[in-house]
């Protein structure tokens, strides 16, 4: 069992405002006393007993920490330190203070495909790095893509929250991971073996949302959403996509493929002509998209 720093985190950090929370985790802004530097402290509630359903299991916490310790990339969040007390494991993480990508885009009245691809290239670069290490994130969605600083012409993004991430070991199958219904791949819905391909599906959903503000598979209920995902039941509605380029739609179509083996890989995505145009004019001719963001 991995042992984390048992000292009192309050001796080393002043904690401030809450930045966000999940089922068993709370993230707060904090300041390191010795340096004055600001970080984000993620307090993960530990599961008391193996039979308990409250809190996060030791195995899951150690897996998240192990993955965070391994990664170092401009588009991925960085781990600073890990503390532990009787009730929580506390991850001291890089502070990503610019808010969610989704909220940033929701504030803009319109965005070009060129602007959307500026963000997507960063997401793809981050995922390329993770996949090169055989790490699947399994929870890619707009809420887990944060801006470092929203008040610059071309904001930099960071992929956050590795609570569901796994190392994909060949011969070692995962089936039981579950993220947010709108973004999960059909193989997750159908409890089939999972791999890096599941992230590529999620990138397809994110791309659809960035260009339209609409969610491709969202139904009135969780069950309806999952049924839509499993059946790959989506369309490019004229209301949202009448001015979207054929290349952008092709990019999405090649990701929202039911068979994981026929889906674009991260390498394919980076080489797709919408992301890597053969000539500049091809990129500049991309039409305006007018999103109507609905959370």
Question: Where are the regions a protein language model picked out?
Answer:
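Activation-segment/catalytic-loop signature of the eukaryotic protein kinase fold
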Residues: 82
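Activation segment signature within eukaryotic-like protein kinase domains
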Residues: 119-120
């Amino acid at each position: 069992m991995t042992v984390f720093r048992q000292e009192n985190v309050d001796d080393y950090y002043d904690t401030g405002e809450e930045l966000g929370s999940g089922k068993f985790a709370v993230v707060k802004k904090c300041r390191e006393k010795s340096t004055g530097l600001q970080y984000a402290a993620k307090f993960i509630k530990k599961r008391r007993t193996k039979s308990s359903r409250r809190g996060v299991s030791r195995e899951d916490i150690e897996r998240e920490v192990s993955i965070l310790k391994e990664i170092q990339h401009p588009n991925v969040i960085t781990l600073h330190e890990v503390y532990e007390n009787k009730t929580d494991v506390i991850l001291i993480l890089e502070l990503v203070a610019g808010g969610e990508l989704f909220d940033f885009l929701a504030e803009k009245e319109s965005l070009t495909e060129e602007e959307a691809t500026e963000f997507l290239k960063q997401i793809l670069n981050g995922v390329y790095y993770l996949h090169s290490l055989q790490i699947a994130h399994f929870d890619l969605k707009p809420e887990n893509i944060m801006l470092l600083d929203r008040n610059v012409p071309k904001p930099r993004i960071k992929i956050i929250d590795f609570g569901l991430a796994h190392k994909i070991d060949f011969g070692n199958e995962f089936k039981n991971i579950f993220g947010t219904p709108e973004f999960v791949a059909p193989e997750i819905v159908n409890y089939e073996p999972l791999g890096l391909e599941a992230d590529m599906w999620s990138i397809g959903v994110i791309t659809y949302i960035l260009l339209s503000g609409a969610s491709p598979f969202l139904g009135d209920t969780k069950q309806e959403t999952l049924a839509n995902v499993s059946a790959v039941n989506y369309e490019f509605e004229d209301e949202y996509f009448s001015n979207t380029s054929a290349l952008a739609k092709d990019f999405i179509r090649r990701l929202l493929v039911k068979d994981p083996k026929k889906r674009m890989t991260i390498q394919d995505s980076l080489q797709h002509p919408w992301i890597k145009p053969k000539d500049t004019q091809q990129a500049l001719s991309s039409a305006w998209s007018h999103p109507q963001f609905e959370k």
